[in-house]
UniProtKB/Swiss-Prot annotation:
PANTHER family: RNA EXONUCLEASE 4, RNA EXONUCLEASE REXO1 / RECO3 FAMILY MEMBER-RELATED. One of its GO terms (cellular component) is nucleus. InterPro entries: Exonuclease_RNaseT/DNA_pol3, REX4_DEDDh_dom, REXO1/3/4-like, RNaseH-like_sf, RNaseH_sf. Residues 25-35 have a biased composition (Low complexity). Keywords: Exonuclease, Hydrolase, Nuclease, Nucleus, rRNA processing. This is RNA exonuclease 4. Belongs to the REXO4 family. Exoribonuclease involved in ribosome biosynthesis. Involved in the processing of ITS1, the internal transcribed spacer localized between the 18S and 5.8S rRNAs.
Length: 375
């Protein structure tokens, strides 16, 4: 019995030793196979990697230099911290403006711009804007009479309202033989004067139209002398003598053409084109409109009595707008007249706001080109 137990224990011990050896050999073989597999994987991965060439090295250097330099951007420095949403809005707005400008390109030309500034489009003119109103601008065209057309006489009168709408436009039948129509500058042709109303008729119509109105003109004393009319100084606005416009043009006698360019940004009286008294009257009124607030303020400061006193002067002086009629003997009653004074007709006082009727010989009144010599 004892020998049987010992034999079984020795058998068990030998079995454990045999199993241990088997497990050890399996572990060593598995570790060996694992290391072998690892070496195989490593060799396989190394074999699959592309061999580095000199070109790859150069490309890597180039990439490194690119990564060091800042990324290129089309935005200015002050816009780099703007959010992408805001930038997108800006881009959309800019593209919209470019599209709209593209639509208008070639449509708004110089002629259309001039038309809009001087009187607006005919389709935009309401019936109220076609009424005479309280402000009228006047311009006259002359033709030459006498020896070689050296003297001027009235040939056309144009009057526009505050908005530039034509209120009156009439050719005048000359009182004397025309020796120079000056078509290149006046736009007047012989056919325009045939059948035109007489001077006295036009004179009376203009006198009735401007009575009690604020009369705007450029060197307006020339137009009044050509018409042989007077008008109260308190109701006159002369763009040729308004000091701020003189300062702007840097000359004592600025031409209407120069003021239109400086103030309105348009070209009038272009070379090769005949003048139009309607266009000149509209340009004069447009210049006046741009200066009206400043003009009114200057007049109020000059008139210490205030707006009420100015209105009373205007109402009293409206009766002074008279038509001169030559005496029976054909001689001028008074050759000396305030209208011949080349000083500004804007400077007025309570004593000089109302003046008498201008009395001039027709030939003297026709000499109305002195201001052109100073341009």
């Amino acid at each position: 019995m004892k020998s049987a137990a010992s034999s079984s224990s020795s058998s068990a011990g030998s079995n454990w030793k045999a199993l241990k050896k088997t497990l050890g050999s399996d572990a060593s073989s598995s570790s060996a196979s694992s290391s072998t597999n690892n070496r195989r994987k490593l060799s396989t991965s190394e074999s699959t990697k592309p061999k580095r060439t000199r070109l790859d090295a150069k490309e890597k250097d180039a990439e490194g230099s690119k990564s060091c330099s800042p990324a290129p951007t089309s935005l200015p420095w002050f816009a780099e911290d703007i959010s992408p949403q805001d930038l997108e809005l800006v881009r959309e707005s800019a593209s919209g403006k470019m599209a709209r400008s593209g639509e208008w390109e070639g449509i708004v030309d110089a002629k259309l711009k001039k038309q809009i500034i001087l009187g607006g489009l005919p389709s935009d003119a309401s019936s109220a804007k076609k009424e005479p109103g309280n402000y009228l601008a006047i311009d006259c065209e002359m033709v030459g009479v006498g020896d070689k057309g050296s003297e001027s006489i009235l040939a056309r009168v144009s009057i526009v309202n505050f908005h530039g709408a034509t209120i009156y436009d009439q050719f005048v039948r000359p009182q004397e033989k025309v020796t120079d129509y000056r078509t290149w500058v006046s736009g007047v042709r012989p056919k325009d004067l045939k059948g035109a109303p007489s001077f006295s008729q036009v004179q009376g119509e203009v006198a009735n139209l401007i009575k009690g109105k604020v009369l705007v003109g450029h060197a307006i004393q020339n137009d009044l002398k050509a018409l042989l009319l007077s008008h109260p100084k308190v109701l006159i606005r002369d763009t040729a003598t308004f000091q701020p416009l003189r300062d702007l043009a840097k000359t004592k006698y600025p031409s209407l053409k120069k003021l239109a360019k400086l103030v309105l940004g348009i070209d009038i009286q272009l070379e090769g084109e005949s003048h139009s008294s309607v266009e000149d009257a509209r340009a004069t009124m447009a210049v006046f409109r741009s200066q009206k607030p400043k003009w009114d303020e200057m007049l109020r400061s000059q008139n210490k009595g205030g707006r009420g006193s100015l209105a009373r002067l205007a109402s009293r002086s409206s009766a002074a707008n008279k038509v001169w009629k030559a005496p029976a003997n054909g001689q001028a009653v008074d050759a000396a007249s305030p209208a011949l004074d080349k000083r500004s007709m804007l400077a007025f006082t309570s004593a000089s706001a109302v003046h008498d009727t201008v009395r001039l010989k027709p030939r003297m009144a026709a000499k109305a080109d002195w201001w052109k010599e100073s341009m």
